[in-house]
A protein has these predicted regions:
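Bacterial N-terminal signal peptides
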Residues: 12-20
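Catalytic-core regions built around general acid/base machinery
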Residues: 139-152
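Boundary at the C-terminal end of the N-terminal hydrophobic targeting segment
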Residues: 24-26
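Portal/gating segments that form or line small-molecule/metal binding sites
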Residues: 75-127, 131-132, 137
């Protein structure tokens, strides 16, 4: 009996140790070097009534040209698209970005990891962040994409695709319709990202404002920094430098920190992280 009890305790301790090491590894695994990173992170796929990704085409064209992606292969991640098929999502993105002159292939068309490994760039679409991260982990793409981007493979994300470029997905606006393995994401930009930021409360709304929701996160994670992107705002990342892009100079990037006033970062300004 004693031997069985010792064996059970030993196995339990070993399992606990493995879980502890696994958790630690998950946090450390995506902290790759940042010097070679090239990324364009859009708050959303649209701006007012300009159409799907139309407002971002000038930024995207410049990004493609600067990174010599014309005629190159782009791995598209469609996993956030819940209300449409992956085929339909791929077709929508191909049509919207036809003028870029890149070859877009969705990772659902084959073995996802192989498509990402052979791609010259990675584009991640918007939708539901929980399902996006859920599928990224199921297909073993989180660490792989983080590593490829650290090696200089250009990355473009919009909405959920921008949220997951941050340290974790915990400042998403989405419903938890799926349970991912972890909230840790690509950590390309080693802070929190909140896309689609809207200030205040609509008339008649008695729930929390976006500011209040983000404050809740900071209360529990006081060392974190959140960058909130209003509609029409984007982050252009080159190594450890960030340029703020935007459609409206009156709607700047916002920086939120624990027990500090919200600070505004002007459109067209640059900062190091």
């Amino acid at each position: 009996m004693k031997r069985r009890m010792i064996l059970k305790v030993g196995v339990a301790s070993l399992v606990a140790l493995c879980l502890s090491v696994s958790s630690l590894s998950a946090k450390e695994a995506f902290n790759f070097p940042k010097d070679k990173q090239k990324a364009l992170l859009l708050s959303s796929s649209g701006y007012k009534d300009t159409g799907y990704l139309n407002h971002a085409l000038p930024w995207l064209k410049e990004f493609v040209e600067k990174n010599k992606l014309k005629g190159k292969k782009v791995a598209f991640i469609p996993y956030a698209g819940v209300r449409k098929s992956y085929d339909a999502y791929e077709a929508q993105v191909k049509k919207a970005l036809e003028s870029l002159g890149v070859e877009i292939i969705s990772v659902h068309k084959g073995k996802a990891a192989d498509i990402v490994k052979s791609a010259d760039a990675i584009f991640v679409g918007g939708g539901n962040t929980f399902e996006l991260v859920n599928q990224l982990y199921k297909n073993k793409l989180v660490e792989l994409i983080a590593k490829r981007v650290s090696e200089g493979v250009p990355y473009v994300g919009w909405s959920a695709g921008s949220n997951v470029a941050g340290a974790t997905m915990q400042t998403t606006n989405d419903m938890p319709i799926a349970e991912p393995e972890s909230f840790n994401t690509f950590n390309i930009f080693p802070h929190q990202i909140n896309p689609h930021f809207i200030s205040g409360k609509p008339v008649g709304h008695n729930g929390e404002s976006r500011e209040e929701r983000l404050e809740e996160f900071l209360i529990l994670n006081p060392k974190s920094i959140i960058y909130a992107l209003p509609e029409g705002v984007a982050l252009l990342i080159d190594g450890k430098k960030v340029k703020v892009l935007g459609m409206d100079k009156k709607a700047p990037l916002l920086k939120l920190e624990h027990k500090k006033d919200i600070s505004k970062i002007a459109i067209d300004s640059e900062f190091d992280y």
